[in-house]
Amino acid sequence: MARPDGRLPDHLRPVTLTRGWSTHPEGSVLVEFGATRVLCTASVTEGVPRWRKGSGLGWVTAEYAMLPRATNTRSDRESVKGRVGGRTHEISRLIGRSLRASIDLKALGENSIVLDCDVLQADGGTRTAAITGAYVALHDAVTWLAARRSLAGRPETVMHRSVAAVSVGVVAGEPRLDLNYAEDASAEVDLNVVCTGAGDFVEVQGTGEAGVFSRGQLDALLDLAVAGCVELAEAQRKALS
């Protein structure tokens, strides 16, 4: 069965990372995975949360949100509802965990960096695009701190590994990389995988949407994901060069 956009099973969608997309933040990136577009901004604050003070460690966290018309039909803003939804909270925490795997918090010193990831247009893979773009925005924010001699460690030691993420799944019995919305909605198995540029795992989230899956299928999906993350790491490297 052909993919909706004609890609081969092991091909990513076209990926674009546009740095400096927003004027005010210390780091900003518009990341595009095909038709999925996420604006990632990094905001630096001197100091850390109260529970972190005196530790000598910095803090990195993230918030995720979607514009009301990022999808086919309009959704109410969560601020209007008066509470953050479970999905939004879960994705925000995933992004934060993933980015903390890329940074030496001791070398960062007692500085805080908040990554805001706002989905402008959704066509599947919003959380994986957010992680991939937010890493580049975080890198730029650390460079900003380094230029002001505000880091506790040597600048080159702060960002000690790259982090990217991609979705994989089984659709019509076939393992596929980087699912768009149509594929994600019909997937029998769906995984989101966060990897370093070296191909080590940071986090794996997966479920059998329409039944169970075998160890062989899982291995095939993880192989696809690692290859995709390595390719995304190269795109990040080029964007930062």
UniProtKB/Swiss-Prot annotation:
Disulfide bond annotation, renumbered to this chain: none
- How does it associate, per the subunit comment? Homohexameric ring arranged as a trimer of dimers.
Provide the function of this protein: Phosphorolytic 3'-5' exoribonuclease that plays an important role in tRNA 3'-end maturation. Removes nucleotide residues following the 3'-CCA terminus of tRNAs; can also add nucleotides to the ends of RNA molecules by using nucleoside diphosphates as substrates, but this may not be physiologically important. Probably plays a role in initiation of 16S rRNA degradation (leading to ribosome degradation) during starvation.
EC no.?
2.7.7.56
Report the InterPro entries cross-referenced here: ExoRNase_PH_dom1 (IPR001247), ExoRNase_PH_dom2 (IPR015847), ExoRNase_PH_dom2_sf (IPR036345), PNPase/RNase_PH_dom_sf (IPR027408), Ribosomal_Su5_D2-typ_SF (IPR020568), RNase_PH (IPR050080), RNase_PH_bac-type (IPR002381), RNase_PH_CS (IPR018336)
Top EC class of this enzyme = transferase
Superkingdom per UniProt: Bacteria
Q: What is this protein called?
A: Ribonuclease PH
Q: What organism does this protein naturally occur in? A: Salinispora tropica (strain ATCC BAA-916 / DSM 44818 / JCM 13857 / NBRC 105044 / CNB-440)
Report the SUPFAM superfamilies cross-referenced here. Answer: Ribonuclease PH domain 2-like (SSF55666), Ribosomal protein S5 domain 2-like (SSF54211)
Query: Taxonomic lineage per UniProt?
Result: Bacteria, Bacillati, Actinomycetota, Actinomycetes, Micromonosporales
Tell me the gene name: rph
Spell out the family assignment given in the record's similarity comment: Belongs to the RNase PH family.
What is catalyzed by this enzyme?
tRNA(n+1) + phosphate = tRNA(n) + a ribonucleoside 5'-diphosphate
